[in-house]
């Protein structure tokens, strides 16, 4: 195992090219942890195309060509990653500050019930469409087995629906 991290780690890579990228990663629990339903909703609320908070804060304002969140639900602890591919006009520092502000706004201001309901609906639909056919079902069950809990395949829809707006602030 890796030694305990005692402080933030920052990596800066400078290469020739026009596309700047900013990514921030925060440690999250292993995939079997009870927080994963809330983390899945946060991925949707912050990282969704067109409706996500990062999209509205960066892409709508011409600061990024693309924004994303990525949090793999793994057997071991992993990272919740927030990112943006920048436009030539945007600076890395500016994009990082905007991402951090959106995270802080979510923590301090919370999530309105309409935004939460929309995120739950999108995830629910994606879950059920992903289970359309034997390949999709086998793929999802295998992912959950690899994560360490096959029953998460069955329980995810109920877990997502049970998450409250307050629970999202605590994760």
Regions found by a protein language model. Name each.
Residues 107, 151-154:
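C-terminal soluble interaction/assembly domains
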Residues 35-37:
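Zinc-dependent metallopeptidase catalytic helix centered on the HExxH motif
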Residues 95-99:
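Hydrophobic alpha-helical membrane-association signature
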């Amino acid at each position: 195992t890796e030694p305990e991290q005692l402080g933030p780690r920052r990596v800066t890579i400078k290469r020739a090219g026009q596309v700047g990228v900013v990514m921030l990663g925060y440690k999250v629990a292993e995939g079997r942890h009870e927080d994963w339903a809330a983390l899945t909703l946060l991925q949707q609320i912050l990282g969704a195309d067109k409706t996500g908070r990062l999209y509205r804060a960066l892409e709508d304002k011409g600061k990024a060509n693309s924004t994303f969140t990525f949090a793999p639900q793994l057997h071991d602890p992993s990272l919740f990653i927030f990112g943006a591919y920048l436009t030539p006009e945007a600076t890395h520092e500016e994009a990082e500050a905007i991402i951090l502000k959106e995270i802080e706004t979510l923590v301090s201001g919370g999530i309105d019930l309409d935004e939460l309901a929309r995120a739950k609906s999108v995830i629910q639909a994606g879950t059920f469409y992903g289970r359309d056919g034997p390949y999709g079902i086998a793929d999802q069950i295998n992912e959950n087995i690899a994560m360490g809990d096959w029953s998460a395949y069955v329980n995810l829809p109920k877990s997502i629906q049970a998450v409250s707006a307050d629970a999202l602030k605590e994760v």
